[in-house]
């Protein structure tokens, strides 16, 4: 199981074309979702997300109104103050959590999330293989890119390719 983040980034980028083809394969084979879910559950059991936190350093976190309310309560600040202090407007995403170029999410301290119990839904569901809105197939759009960020995504996609005999070109 590959967990070194430098290798994950390099290998994830190297196999991105294969992962794009895999996404099309999965869309055309609905029964594949159960197999992929089973593999993802197995990989998630073997990798401790909280020891990695790479998603917190490299991903954009879109916030819902519910997330703002939850953060407001946790931080004991009114929603307008949370928005002013901890978010940025994004033309494509609405409100997003502020990020620091060096460490990522403003709530990340080393690999610890300072708001873990009250983190946004998108963070709770990450890497969106098992949890998240809609079907796994509907969430597959971002998986080729996430394979270079998340050891769980990378290892899940590689294990699935092995299991089904997917022909690699990358």
Predicted feature descriptions by range:
Residues 1-170:
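Short loop/turn segments that flank or connect secondary-structure elements
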């Amino acid at each position: 199981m590959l967990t070194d983040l430098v290798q994950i980034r390099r290998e994830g980028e190297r196999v991105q074309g294969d992962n794009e083809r895999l996404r099309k394969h999965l869309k055309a084979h609905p029964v594949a979702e159960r197999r992929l879910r089973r593999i993802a559950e197995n990989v998630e059991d073997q990798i401790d997300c909280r020891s990695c936190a790479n998603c917190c350093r490299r991903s954009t976190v879109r916030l819902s109104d519910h997330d703002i309310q939850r953060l407001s309560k946790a931080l004991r600040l009114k929603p307008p103050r949370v928005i002013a202090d901890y978010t940025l407007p994004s033309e494509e995403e609405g409100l997003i959590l502020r990020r620091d170029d060096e460490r990522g999410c403003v709530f990340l301290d080393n690999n610890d999330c300072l708001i873990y119990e009250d983190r946004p839904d998108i963070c709770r569901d990450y890497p969106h293989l098992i949890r998240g809105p809609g079907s796994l197939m509907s969430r597959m759009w971002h998986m080729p890119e996430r394979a270079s960020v998340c050891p769980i995504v990378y290892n899940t996609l590689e294990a699935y390719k092995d299991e089904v005999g997917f022909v690699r070109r990358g």
